[in-house]
Amino acid sequence: MKRLEKMEVSEKRIKVSEKRSPKIFLSGSIRGGRQLLGTYRFMFDTLEEAGAEVLSWHVADPELEKTEMRMTEEEIYARDMGLLLKSDALIAEVTVPSTGVGYEICRALVQRIPVLCLYSPDASVSAMVLGNPDHLLDARAYPDKASLKKIITEFILAL
């Protein structure tokens, strides 16, 4: 009997110590403008440092346009929606208005996936984001990269 008890305790320790990396869908403007590519890359790096697995790494890829030129609209949609459905959370940079980012946010909320929207304090962010009462959506302004890193890290650790 004692051996069985030890085995159960040891299995519990393994489960606690094997906390898996959260899977994150990173969302940012692509066709709406790539002027924040450096910010997307910073967000990607911050997520990896925090122990997250970024499923939509292509958002931070400077060669994305070349890659997506070889894909149909349907292939891009299927890839992105497939990755979103595998995600534990969505983190979106919403400073640059983007129909695609808005669509991804909405789909995540419909699927009950937590969403963190980040934006520059001087951005004109849609009321559909800032006024959304869904408790799974958190919208936060970041004045600098240190604040951006802190907000992302705290969000990941809370998942």
UniProtKB/Swiss-Prot annotation:
The protein's enzyme class: hydrolase
Catalytic activity, EC: 3.2.2.-
GO molecular function: 5-hydroxymethyl-dUMP N-hydrolase activity
UniProt keyword annotation of Hydrolase present: yes
Name of one Pfam family that matches: Nuc_deoxyrib_tr
Recorded catalytic activity of this chain's protein: a pyrimidine 2'-deoxyribonucleoside 5'-phosphate + H2O = a pyrimidine nucleobase + 2-deoxy-D-ribose 5-phosphate; a purine 2'-deoxyribonucleoside 5'-phosphate + H2O = a purine nucleobase + 2-deoxy-D-ribose 5-phosphate
Chain sites annotated for binding substrate: F25, L26, S27, G28, S29, I30, R31, Y40, H58, E104, S126, A127, M128
GO biological process: deoxyribonucleoside monophosphate catabolic process; nucleoside metabolic process; nucleotide metabolic process
UniProt xrefs under InterPro entries: 2'-dNMP_N-hydrolase, DNPH1, Nucleoside_deoxyribTrfase
Function according to Swiss-Prot or TrEMBL: Catalyzes the cleavage of the N-glycosidic bond of deoxyribonucleoside 5'-monophosphates to yield deoxyribose 5-phosphate and a purine or pyrimidine base.
Protein family per UniProt: Belongs to the 2'-deoxynucleoside 5'-phosphate N-hydrolase 1 family.
The name this protein goes by in its record: Putative 2'-deoxynucleoside 5'-phosphate N-hydrolase 1
Organism encoding this protein: Methanosarcina barkeri (strain Fusaro / DSM 804)
